[in-house]
Each structure stands twice: as C-alpha cells, then as structure tokens.
Design a protein with these regions (language model features):
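RNA pseudouridine synthases
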Residues: 2-318
Length: 318
C-alpha cells in the first residue's frame, strides 16, 4: 500500500522533485524513477518532476520510500547551537561563528546546512541558508524556514548588476566589519568607494584584480559604472564596496565595508589590493605582515531587507 505526504504551508510553492528530495531519504535517480513510472502522484494524478506542489496537496509515494522524519533523530530548535538574532515562523537569523562552513563540501565535516537538517528533521520543509558566508567569516546569516521565505531571502541577497547605479545612492544592504593592517583613515576618507574588476586565477586558486577605479563620492562611483559597465570584461567582474574607518589602534584599523556586489573573497581582495589586507589573512596578506598572534576578523554585522511579509522588521544588526 502506498504512503502519502501532506504538503504544509511551509513547503508549498516548490517543485515536486525538490519537495521529495527534502522529505525523503532517497537518491535523485530513485526519485526521478518513481515520478516517471507513476509511483508518485499529486492528489491521485500522475505528476512531473517540475510540477509545483501547493498547501494541502496529497503526495503519494511508494511504500518503501524512506521518510526523512522517520529515519533521522528528532531534535528541536531549542537545542540549536548558535546564537539566534531573530526568529519567527518564516525566518531564522543566527550569528554564525567563525570556523564553520555554510554548506557541505570537500573537507567540511560540519556545516550549517547539515545541522539544520538534523535539528529540523521532523519538519516537512527543512530550513536552509539563503546566502553564504565564508567559513572564516562570522556574523549574520539568514535562514528561510519555509520555501517562500527562503526564495524571498535568496533573491534579496543577490546583487542586481543592472541597478548598481541606483544602489550606490544608498547604504549597501550588507555591511561588514574587519580589522586590517595599517592606518587606513586617510585612504578611507579620500576613497570611500572601492571599485575593482576581479577574476579567478585558476593556477593560484585565488581571486585577483584585473583593474581598479576608486571613487571619492557616490557620483564618481556612478560615473565609473556608466563608463565601464557591469558586464564581465576579460572574465573579470565588477566588485563594488563602500569603505569607512571606525578605529585605528596599534598599527591596525577597524573598518566598515558595505558590499553592493557579492564576489568571492571580495572584501579580502579589495582591501589587500588597496594596501590594507585583513589581519591574519594567510591567503591575501603579504607574509611579511603576518604574525602568529594575529587573529582573522571579518564579521557580517548588518543586513537590510526591503519591506516584506516574512519579517516584522527590516534591519538586523549585531
């Protein structure tokens, strides 16, 4: 006799294949085969992998399909091991510690995504990070607890290459803090906007600068975008950020960086290229600056969302 799953409000709106992938302990090819052979049905009707499931839909599955809720140990979010900044029925926002990856990968034994799967094992929809922070970056991480909120948050965290000119007229929606080598006060005062075109060096396995055009104000930044555009050139992509010096102490500076684009290692590369690498950054800082006692610090400290139906507030900070 076939089993069935009921689509909850949290899980509605996603594709059938994604719903089954999140609900069952099964390989992708198994799920596709069950759908293709009619062993999976939506409200007693044959379905396709990319059909959208809705709240209260009944999804028939084979009797031998292992339900994730039955095969994983049940835990509650009360045991969640990270500081919670904000939470409601749609969204969970945590303070991610340094040293843990957001997603699994080579050599990543522990990551946020797998921890969410474990702690929400009984849920019909497993919450997931809406964006990524590097393993060594700490701070605000947005997590969608429903399919709809996850999709909304993911879209919010994307940079819109077509509207960068409008974006730089306002504060960036993602703000970071970092300690850098050197006294950056004068540089930050004269160059509050950093504009680099970055590319990935396969041989060195790091991001490098194709060329630089810094700006003294928002109008100059808009002019740079208008002149050079946002489309990749020679495989290099635009990386745009604002810069402010908060404190200078013992030959190091605490800075605030607002990013308008989301390039890999963007903050680390832009500051290193400007002559002020992050303290303890073994990948981009010159070895002559590095000291054993230096501790890497890069923190996502503020995120601004547009008005929405999923959160009661729009600005989140630590």
């Amino acid at each position: 006799m076939a089993n069935s799953l009921l689509v909850t409000a949290q899980a509605g709106g996603q594709k059938l294949f994604n719903f089954l992938k999140r609900s069952l302990h099964a390989e992708n090819n198994e799920i596709h085969r069950w759908i293709r052979t009619g062993q999976v049905r939506i409200n007693k009707k044959r379905a396709k992998a990319f059909d959208i499931v809705h709240e209260n839909d009944e999804i028939r599955i084979p009797p031998f399909a292992p339900n994730r809720a039955d095969t994983l140990p049940k835990k509650t979010v009360k045991e969640f091991p990270f500081p919670v900044i904000y939470e409601n029925e749609h969204v969970l926002i945590i303070d991610k510690p340094r040293g843990i990856a957001c997603q699994g990968g080579t050599g990543q034994k522990e990551n946020i995504a797998d921890i969410l799967k474990e702690y929400y094992s009984a849920a019909n929809f497993v919450p997931a990070p809406a964006h990524r922070l590097d393993k060594e970056t700490q701070g605000i991480l947005l997590i969608g607890k429903t399919y709809q909120s996850l999709r909304f948050l993911t879209e919010c965290m994307k940079s819109d290459e077509n509207s960068l000119r409008q974006a730089v007229r306002h504060e960036a929606k993602k703000i970071y803090r970092a300690w850098v080598y050197g006294d950056i006060a004068d540089f930050a005062r004269n160059t509050p906007f950093l504009c680099h075109y970055l590319y990935h060096n396969e041989e060195k396995q790091k991001e490098e600068v194709f060329f630089v055009r810094h700006a003294a104000n928002r109008k100059e930044t808009e002019d740079i975008i208008s002149k050079y555009g946002t489309k990749p050139m020679q495989k290099a992509q635009i990386a745009l950020a604002s810069l402010k010096c908060l404190e200078v102490k013992n030959g190091k500076s605490l800075v605030e960086i607002g990013i308008y684009t989301g390039r890999k290692h963007q903050i680390r590369v832009q500051l290193a290229s400007s002559g002020f690498p992050l303290v303890g950054d073994t990948k981009y800082a010159p070895k002559t600056l590095l000291r054993k006692k230096d501790e890497f610090f890069l923190q996502a400290c503020k995120i601004t969302l547009p008005p929405n139906d999923f959160t009661e507030q729009c600005v989140f900070g630590i």
